């Protein structure tokens, strides 16, 4: 994974648990006229101290031809594939290995830059690499080409549910016997003038904490006023269970539930009654054959918006009933911001780590919880050790698209 806390799973996870925030002022462009000036950028550097060094993953000439969401996606995929030991499948193994990596927005910075260039200097100045360097499916395409993965080559585009949908859909392809191995997840890098302006004009971003960026993302807190844009990528390798066991693969968890729903309500606002979120979670539980009381930890969508946080919390309480008092729920967006199309995949990885290590990551800045938070452990301010055998991870997106994943501890 690549996140605003750094490059790699260990770096990001250790910093999440220690309560660090990836939020800061915008550095990519002059944001002095921007209403919202707080974002969570990937820390770029020479690779030391967890900084992201793109040269570790791509040749400079190749990197210049693509937008950063593709760079982040390739980097996260390389980490995942190397960790899984699946770097060079051959023959039928290659034909039964696929890719499903999506993005909510894709190459928006490059589109913006090329549009300005064309209008200022004419169409002949547009790069021949412009189209393949911005298309959302080109993360999957690049990874497929790089590792010779000849199975399903697909991309998901469902706004902020993209990463979760990609993992869930890829798991279903394996269940349907279309593949034995799928590289799946999401990548995003849309922090650019038009991207920030668009979300800000939609009144979606935090503006109250421009002078104290680390305080801006505060799910369920009474002082929340919008989400903080983030960027990065989260990629996992999914594998048919017997196939994984046969080759002695390291198994982090087992995907047992996947639920989807549509709000059919509004292009940006969630349905006020939370019914879409409720039905996605219920469908995931049904698919898993589990009761609400079987879930120990929920990684909430929890974006820090006044409306969305409240609605998700209500849906969780409605579905889980009395069992809600026994679980822990937190939002890692309080640390890394909202990674949009990459969020669901990154959060699924964090959830698996929480399960492996029996520790729930914290919800930062939850200093004054909303009254509706009573009766549920939202892991305020500090990580919490507790038994975690099964997790549920929520992702909800513009257009009313909802996804819930359930992953449980793997046992023989």
Set out the residue ranges of the language-model regions:
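Flexible, low-complexity linker/loop segments at domain and module junctions
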Residues: 89-94, 288-294, 325, 374-412
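Condensing-enzyme catalytic core mediating Claisen C-C bond formation in acyl metabolism
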Residues: 2, 21-25, 35, 210-288, ...
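Glycine-/small-residue-rich "gating" segment that lines the acyl/pantetheine channel
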Residues: 120-127, 165-168, 172, 176, ...
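Conserved beta-ketoacyl condensing-enzyme motif
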Residues: 13, 17-158, 187-198, 292-310
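Active-site-proximal alpha-helical scaffold in enzymes
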Residues: 73-86, 136-139, 144-188, 227-249, ...
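Phosphate/pyrophosphate-binding loops at sites that engage ATP/ADP/AMP, CoA/4′-phosphopantetheine
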Residues: 80-94, 244-251, 281-297, 319-323
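Active-site-adjacent elements of ketosynthase-type condensing enzymes
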Residues: 31-45, 108-110, 189-217, 259-279, ...
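ACP-dependent fatty acid/polyketide chain-elongation machinery
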Residues: 1-62, 242-254, 349-363, 408-412
């Amino acid at each position: 994974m690549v996140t605003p806390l750094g490059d790699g799973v260990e770096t990001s996870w250790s910093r999440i648990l220690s309560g660090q925030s990836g939020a800061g002022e915008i550095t990519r462009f002059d944001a002095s006229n921007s209403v919202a000036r707080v974002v969570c950028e990937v820390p770029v550097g020479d690779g030391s101290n967890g900084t992201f060094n793109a040269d570790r993953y791509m040749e400079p000439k190749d990197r210049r031809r693509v937008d950063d969401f593709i760079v982040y996606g390739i980097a996260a995929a390389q980490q995942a594939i190397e960790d899984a030991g699946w770097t060079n499948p051959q023959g039928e193994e290659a034909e039964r290995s696929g890719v499903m990596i999506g993005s909510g927005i894709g190459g928006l910075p490059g589109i913006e830059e090329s549009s300005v260039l064309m209008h200022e200097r004419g169409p002949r100045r547009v790069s021949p690499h412009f189209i393949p360097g911005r298309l959302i499916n080109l993360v999957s395409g690049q990874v497929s080409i790089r590792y010779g993965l000849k199975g399903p080559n697909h991309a998901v585009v469902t706004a902020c549910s993209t990463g979760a949908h990609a993992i869930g859909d890829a798991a279903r392809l394996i269940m349907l016997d279309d593949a034995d191995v799928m590289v799946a997840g999401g990548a995003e890098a849309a922090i650019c003038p038009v991207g920030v302006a668009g979300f800000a004009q939609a009144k979606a971003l935090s503006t109250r904490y421009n002078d104290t960026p680390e305080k801006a993302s505060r799910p369920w807190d009474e002082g929340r006023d919008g989400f903080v844009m983030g960027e990065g990528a989260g990629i996992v390798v999914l594998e048919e269970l017997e196939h994984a066991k046969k080759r002695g693969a390291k198994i982090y968890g087992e995907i047992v539930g996947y639920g989807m729903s549509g709000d059919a309500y509004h292009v940006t606002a969630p349905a006020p009654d939370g019914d879409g979120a409720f039905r996605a979670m219920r469908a995931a539980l049904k698919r898993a054959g589990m009761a609400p009381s079987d879930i120990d930890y929920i990684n909430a969508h929890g974006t820090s918006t006044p409306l969305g946080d409240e609605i998700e919390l209500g849906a969780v309480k409605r579905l889980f009933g009395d069992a809600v008092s026994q679980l822990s729920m937190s939002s890692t967006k309080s640390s890394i911001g909202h990674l949009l199309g990459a969020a669901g995949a990154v959060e699924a990885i964090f959830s698996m780590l929480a399960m492996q290590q029996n520790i729930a990551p914290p919800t930062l800045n939850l200093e004054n919880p909303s009254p509706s938070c009573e009766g549920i452990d939202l892991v305020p301010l500090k990580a919490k050790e507790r038994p975690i055998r099964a997790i549920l991870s929520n992702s909800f997106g513009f257009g009313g698209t909802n996804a819930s994943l359930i992953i449980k501890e793997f046992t023989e």
